[in-house]
């Protein structure tokens, strides 16, 4: 009986190893399925976002276009502006500069609120960005975690799905990034640097001093890949 113990132990270890390999394979298949589903949902949202932005731009054009009215046959005599000695009155409200805008336009698409979409040509990425962050929302698209484009402190979080932010680690300084908001404004950025940071480094991400920050989990889940970007000067 004693001689059979090592053989039985070996069989148990082989069986346990096979179970672990099978579990890892099933986990890989599950993660791939989740990633593909997230990619399909993001693609569907992108179509809706582009359509919504186009509609808003058309509406804006119609609202700002001047009304053309045919002049009557007997037009009123033109006013002699040179003889008008009444001084124009300018109120304090008219002279004060408008307060800087801080809030981004939010539009609902497929039941969720979005602030626009991000494009990163270097890794062939085009993804919608939800207005608010949550674990459930991240399963669909990347989400705004902090800030806004207007205040140059936008932070976008995304899962490390293959169709989402898994390729952030491939970006290098100088790679271009663009963000299109729901008003049709396109903001151009360039990657400044990339770092691997702990999940607790919230302040370093939120108050980085950079105009745009993108981040995702590493495969271990213990750290974060963080990409810092800054606006590029218009050419």
Annotate the PLM regions.
Residues 8-235:
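Solvent-exposed, non-transmembrane regions of membrane-associated and secreted proteins
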Residues 1-9:
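N-terminal Lys/Arg-rich, disordered targeting/topogenic segments
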């Amino acid at each position: 009986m004693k001689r059979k113990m090592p053989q039985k132990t070996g069989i148990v270890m082989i069986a346990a190893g096979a179970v672990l390999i099978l579990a890892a394979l099933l986990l890989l298949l599950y993660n791939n399925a989740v990633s593909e589903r997230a990619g399909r949902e993001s693609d569907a949202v992108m179509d809706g976002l582009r359509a919504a932005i186009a509609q808003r731009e058309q509406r804006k054009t119609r609202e700002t276009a001047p009304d053309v009215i045919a002049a009557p046959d007997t037009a009123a005599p033109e006013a002699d502006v040179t003889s008008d000695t009444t001084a124009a009155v300018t109120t304090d409200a008219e002279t004060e500069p408008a307060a800087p805008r801080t809030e981004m336009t939010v539009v609902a698409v497929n039941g969720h609120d979005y602030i626009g979409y991000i494009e990163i040509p270097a890794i062939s990425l085009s993804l919608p960005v939800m207005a608010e962050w949550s674990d459930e929302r991240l399963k669909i698209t990347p989400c705004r975690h902090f800030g806004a484009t207007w205040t140059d402190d936008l932070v976008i979080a995304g899962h490390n799905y293959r169709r989402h932010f898994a390729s952030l680690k491939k970006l290098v300084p100088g790679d271009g990034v663009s963000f299109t908001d729901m008003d049709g404004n396109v903001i151009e950025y360039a990657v400044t640097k990339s770092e691997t940071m702990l999940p607790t480094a919230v302040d370093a991400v939120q108050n980085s001093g950079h105009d745009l920050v993108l981040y995702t989990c590493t495969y271990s889940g213990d750290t974060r890949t963080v990409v810092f970007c800054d606006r590029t000067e218009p050419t």
